[in-house]
Amino acid sequence: MKKYILFFLALSSTLNACGSPNGLGIEEPNAYVQAINIPVAGNTFQTAGPSTDAITSNGIASWTQTNTQYSLFFKTDKALRCRIQLIGTMDPSHTIRIKIGQTIRTLIPGTNGEIDAGEFSLSAGYQEVSLQGMSKKTANYATITDLRIEINEDISGISYVKDNVDNRFYWGRRGPSVHLTYTVPAGLNLKWMYNEVSIPLQMDPIGSYFMANGFGEGYFGMQVNSDTERRILFSVWSPYVTDNPASIPDDQKIKLVKKGPQVYTGEFGNEGAGGQSYLRYPWVAGKTYQFLNSVEPDSQGNTVYTAYFKEKEATEWLLIAQFLRPKTSTWYKRPHSFVENFDPLFGHITRKATYQNPWMVDSGGQWVELQEVKLTGDDIARRGYRLDYDGGVSNNQFFLQNGGFFNSSALLNSMSARPAQQQKPSIDFQKLP
């Protein structure tokens, strides 16, 4: 009887092994019921290598350099098991390494435009999929249009830039812009806004615009324009709505009243149009800078806008510019700050600003400390295409942060407040240049 039992168990084991597709008892990949294709063009950055291997509107089309590395990012709302493939073409003789978390593998090209990477276990949060060319025999490592994820979960829990409607691949690679709108008392004719801005160390990549003092018709802040150039920027939109400054009628053009030494003034376009001024200034992360600007009607149907800037330790304010906006009669409306990235090559790097001591001054000289803000975001943030943003109050300071694919639980349209700091600035407005 014992021999029959042993024979039955051995036969059963053999049949089970033969019943597996490979006949060796090795488990085949899971069958997944949901799949999404993440467009490379809107979700990938070149994180190493020469700029000749740029990402196009169709994804990775020319990958010629061995030291080029690409990173694609997406976010999952929970841990999951998945299968990952790349959609594109790859010569079978080429070797490309893929890294997700701590898992590193070699890609296997298929015959149906699919390059298999295998199965992965992902934790909740942002994922980085890195691709590194190792060896090749032809000019191009691969062409890749999409990253395909197969899962057994609800695909709505995966966040990424989904489409290129209204040029969203471009805006998505720039990253989510976020804003703080300050709560102000009703019934006051607000004239001045004062703010103190500091950028934490290593939070100032190229493409950053740390806007300090925004108003209904323009903005005032500091930029990182290149490795060698930084600017203090002050702009006022024309009342004529257009993206082309050349189309603005003469009676609706922004007029320069005065400007500071070494300040450039001209016109700007693309995101509205109007008058622009900037001072090339080597500001640095880790220091605090002061911004002061005014909005005042001239009683003749125009409004005058003036901006001043200085380091906190300095004694003299620098005049940036004074503009006159025709066909406008308003005091300072909608005071706000924002952080944005204007260069899509650097949307994978985090930037952050702190706003430490914002105040308003009304037309009668009354100072009002700003203690409450509302966090809002641009189209990319509101759609949930990019969720790497934060803002509100931290350590009794207002702050904004975006880019870099960090995990955040910030909620758009949420309110944050801080107690009064009672650090009113000492400014002699009569002595301003």
Identify the function of each model-found stretch.
Residues 6-7, 18, 415, 430:
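Intrinsic disorder/low-complexity detector
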Residues 9-30:
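Bacterial Sec-dependent N-terminal signal peptides
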Residues 1-4:
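Positively charged n-region of N-terminal signal peptides that target proteins for export
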